């Protein structure tokens, strides 16, 4: 079974990882050439907030990113994926939600991102072709599914983090 294969290093390397890469349409090593652009930053209550964009030149993609860093940062970084994208990091008053606040208090930086079609005002429906011969094959046959596109966004941000491009984080220790 898949769970038995995933429990071994050989099973992961030979079966599970290639299967996931096939489903997603991209591997970590194929994430592409990425660049970080800082858009704005602010410090408040011992937390530095940096908003920026990670651009993937190889695949023509960009991901909006928010980085929250505590003043007493210990070096770890958590990637925070939520239903509201970067908005999942904070409450309506702009304060970090409880779980994010605990991470920051422990000295951990937190990175949130707006995944594909996850911005504050996502479209109400999937796009459709405006012709008599509408066919889902044109939308879904030529494009990766939503899960794969969002996974591409995570891989793009991971690539930027691993190269030390996001904020002032530097290269990871591991």
Predicted regions: what they are:
Residues 73-170:
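Cap/lid segment of the alpha/beta-hydrolase catalytic domain
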Residues 174:
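Gly/Ala-rich beta-loop-alpha elbow adjacent to hydrolase catalytic centers
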Residues 1-67, 148, 156:
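Non-catalytic accessory segments flanking enzyme active sites
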Residues 70:
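Soluble catalytic regions of membrane-associated enzymes that act on cell-envelope
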